[in-house]
Regions:
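Post-transcriptional modification and biogenesis factors for structured RNAs
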Residues: 1-185
């Protein structure tokens, strides 16, 4: 759902499975008792008529985000009721929440870091040796929904042979990065 009124009481149906995106966002930016300081999460909304819309959440700038799906859904609802900015332009809608037109390829073009494309049918992510100059700030992950992404950009890696929900993948990736587990890039 890229524009219109987001039904907060029916995010799993009337909002085109916005509940899945909200859980992924929450897994990306929230810890047990706070907000991660080193995460940018960009969701790409393709639902409905019209072009794709991007909403970017910058964790160290966020204010008023709470660990409750409807509250986070309300932040998204406030963005999508606004007119969409042109492709390639970001408009700050509230602290740490940016709105812009664009698609996955445009987003990846903006990132200046190695990109890992999560795909259950690829080599495992968590084996190998970390590069000596590895930094969390210098890696990006992309994932889709219940099927592989159409984009072939990024290094394909797997978290296992089963297709997992996006928010679970994000939690696993955070664990691997937080614990310094060796990644196969």
């Amino acid at each position: 759902m890229a524009k219109g009124k987001l039904p907060l009481n029916d995010m799993a149906g009337g909002a085109g499975r916005m509940d899945v995106l909200v859980r992924a966002l929450m897994s990306s930016i929230l810890t047990s008792h706070g907000i991660r300081e080193d995460v940018e999460f960009t969701m790409i909304l393709l639902g409905g008529p019209g072009p794709a819309r991007r909403i970017k959440f910058v964790s160290n700038e966020l204010k008023g985000v709470h660990a409750e799906e409807r509250s986070v859904g309300g932040k998204i609802a406030a963005v999508i009721k606004e007119p969409m900015p042109p492709r390639g332009h970001w408009v700050e809608r509230s602290p740490g929440i940016y709105d812009g037109g664009g698609d996955l390829d445009m987003t990846l073009d903006e990132w200046d870091c190695p990109i890992i494309r999560l795909d259950a049918d690829s080599k495992n992510l968590y084996s190998g040796v970390l590069p000596s100059d590895f930094s969390i700030a210098e890696i990006g992950f992309i994932l889709g929904d219940d099927k592989p992404l159409e984009s072939t950009r990024g290094i394909p890696r797997s978290l296992g042979s089963s297709w997992l929900q996006g928010h679970t993948c994000i939690s696993i990736v955070h664990f691997l990065l937080d614990e310094g587990i060796q990644l196969q890039l």
